[in-house]
């Protein structure tokens, strides 16, 4: 096929973008009228709707670092081979970067490969790390620890992940990639042979009772030769394809963490641009994995965050309140006293590493980034690994793409089996291999885990002739409340310690109240019979946004779900002891808008 000029791609993109919105609007007018006339006479909504469809070469679910890197790499490969390919990226956030949350210190190794002239193009990597500190905290004291290779950030940058993602989106759109924010991918579509056909976006304007409102819009079916799942940690559709294709049958159980972050404005006297601080120890006990970070970047701003491994055992533990307590430590509070908190967010992290990675490909699609689990937990970094996984996937997917005009029967999806081999031959595999034994060693507790990590990383250099196993699923680690002691947390003072509601306000949430619940209980009574009676309702503590609340109703306890508070961290989907809670996508553009987070 002859090479297509960039201008042609741009014209095609300009035409297709309004087309998708136009088809959606027209469908709304026609289908809504039919459904209201029929009044849904005993017919489920999904059976009443005839959805419109559009076909692309590639559909990518999620406009994060991995999804956008895959799109850019695919367009680069197409240009190098004189081809034009169509790529659609759907993003559930209100804009690219709206739901992107990380510490974040980025290693530019993958960006150097993807866009070598990123500095000239104005990438928002402007705050180089100038100093690393690693602390071990007791309740009153802080001890400086040696900066091990994992915590050496020379050559790295303190960034806002949201800003990086928005910049990547600009680069992708300039190459002809179509990005549609505000469209939540709600369903995986399959060919008759079981291979992935694409995705369907969610219906919008459905009331809490499941009936259409005046603003009803049906979802769209987006078909593709290859569908790339780049939803991030615990993606709802990624979870489905992993289960359907049994992609994790040869993997160890995945393990997760919950990361909570704030941004503060501090006085110039306390601001140290480029300083990166990591800490372990207090306030967590010796059986709970976790740690904290303090990053000084521009304009007197400091990012402070706290990560708790979701394999913790005590149901009374509250990651949010552990974070608030952390800021009261004498070594930490001196940075923030007199400052002002300006942003808040939370997100789950996928920590299992190499031995927990699922099979990466299946017929019709692949998993990339944190949807698969490429985070390097010992380095507390996942942006560069997500980007590299996406680039490898793009290289494996591109040769499978046929000219759609020449495809007679689009009725089966091919498998990019080469993706796994490319991964195993890359620096990404070597990095994750060297880190593989760190996280599982903490099943022995913080002290033994730390000693083992020192031996593994400093003596064996990550090449020990064995691979440790994780101790099981996170939700299975909780002990019964009767076997644990309640934890007494300090009360909010509005200075260093805050409550959940004032924190969630800073996440800039948007949520249409009149929509079906996106936090689905398989059995509502289980939340009382098991969670409340046996585990003291841990969901009221592990949720960092105050979504779950026990209230009295007619003298009996009842779980109240405040869905509008949800920051889309997915912790409930991971940690609920009976796996009774399923997180699904709410309407597109719902959730936080993290902006400069």
What are these regions (language model features)?
Residues 52-66, 88:
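Beta1/beta-strand and adjacent pyrophosphate-binding region of the FAD-binding site
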Residues 347-373, 377, 504-514, 527-542:
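FAD-binding beta-loop-beta segment adjacent to the flavin cofactor pocket
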Residues 151-170, 313-317:
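Short beta-strand to alpha-helix junction loop
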Residues 377-379, 395-443, 592:
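Active-site-proximal substrate-binding core of FAD-dependent oxidoreductases
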Residues 92-139:
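N-terminal FAD cofactor-binding segment of flavoenzymes
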Residues 75-99:
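Glycine-rich FAD pyrophosphate-binding loop
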Residues 533-564, 571-593:
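Iron-sulfur cluster-binding cysteine motifs and their immediate structural context
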Residues 174-332, 392:
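Predominantly flavin-linked oxidoreductase catalytic cores and closely associated redox partners
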């Amino acid at each position: 096929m002859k090479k297509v000029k960039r201008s042609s791609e741009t014209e095609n993109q300009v035409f297709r973008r309004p087309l998708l919105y136009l088809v959606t609007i027209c469908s709304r007018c026609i289908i809504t009228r039919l459904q209201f006339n029929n009044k849904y006479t005993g017919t489920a909504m999904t059976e009443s709707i005839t959805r419109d469809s559009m076909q692309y070469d590639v559909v990518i679910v999620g406009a994060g670092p991995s999804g956008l890197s895959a799109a850019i790499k695919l367009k680069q490969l197409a240009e190098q081979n004189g081809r034009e390919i169509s790529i659609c990226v759907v993003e559930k956030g209100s804009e690219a970067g709206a739901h992107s949350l990380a510490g974040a210190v980025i290693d530019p190794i993958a960006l150097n490969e993807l866009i070598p002239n990123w500095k000239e193009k104005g990438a928002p990597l402007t705050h180089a790390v100038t100093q690393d500190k690693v602390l071990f905290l007791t309740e009153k004291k802080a001890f400086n620890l040696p900066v091990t290779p994992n915590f050496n950030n020379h050559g790295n940058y303190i960034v806002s992940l949201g800003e990086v993602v928005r910049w990547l989106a600009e680069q992708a759109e300039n190459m002809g990639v179509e990005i549609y924010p505000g469209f939540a991918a709600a369903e995986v579509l399959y060919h008759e042979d079981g291979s992935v056909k694409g995705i369907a976006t969610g219906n919008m304007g459905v009331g809490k009772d499941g009936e259409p409102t005046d603003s009803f819009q049906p979802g769209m079916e987006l078909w593709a030769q290859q569908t790339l799942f780049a939803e991030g940690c615990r993606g709802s559709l990624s979870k489905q394809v992993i289960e359907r294709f049994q992609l994790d049958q040869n993997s160890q159980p995945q393990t997760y963490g919950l990361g909570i972050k704030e941004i503060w404005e501090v006085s110039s006297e306390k601001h140290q641009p480029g300083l990166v601080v990591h800490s372990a120890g207090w306030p967590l006990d010796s059986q709970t994995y976790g740690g904290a970070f303090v990053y000084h970047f521009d304009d007197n701003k400091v990012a402070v965050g706290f990560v708790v491994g979701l394999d913790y055992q005590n149901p009374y533990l509250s990651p949010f309140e552990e974070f608030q307590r952390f800021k009261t430590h004498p070594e930490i509070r001196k940075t923030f006293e007199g400052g002002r908190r300006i942003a808040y967010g939370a997100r789950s992290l996928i920590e299992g590493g190499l031995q927990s990675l699922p099979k990466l490909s299946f017929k019709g699609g692949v998993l990339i980034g944190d949807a698969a689990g490429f985070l390097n937990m010992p380095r507390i970094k996942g942006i560069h690994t997500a980007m590299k996984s996406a680039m490898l996937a793009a290289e494996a997917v591109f040769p499978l793409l046929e000219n759609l005009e020449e495809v007679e029967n689009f009725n089966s999806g091919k498998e990019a089996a080469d993706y796994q081999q490319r991964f195993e031959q890359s620096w990404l595999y070597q990095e994750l291999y060297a880190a593989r034994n760190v996280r599982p060693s903490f099943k022995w507790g913080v002290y033994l885990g730390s000693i083992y990590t020192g031996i593994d990383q400093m003596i064996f250099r990550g090449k020990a002739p064995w691979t440790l196993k994780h101790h099981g699923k996170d939700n299975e680690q909780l002990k019964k409340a009767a076997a644990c002691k309640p934890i007494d947390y300090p009360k909010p003072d509005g200075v260093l310690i805050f409550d959940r509601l004032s924190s969630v306000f800073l996440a800039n949430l948007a949520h249409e109240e009149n929509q079906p619940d996106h936090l689905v209980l398989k059995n509502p009574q289980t939340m009382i019979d098991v969670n409340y009676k046996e585990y003291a309702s841990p969901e009221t503590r592990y949720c960092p946004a105050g979504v779950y609340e026990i209230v009295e109703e007619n003298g009996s306890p009842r779980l109240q779900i405040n869905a509008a508070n949800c920051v889309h961290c997915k912790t409930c989907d991971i940690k609920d002891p009976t796996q009774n809670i399923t997180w699904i996508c709410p309407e597109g553009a719902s959730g936080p808008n993290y902006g400069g987070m």
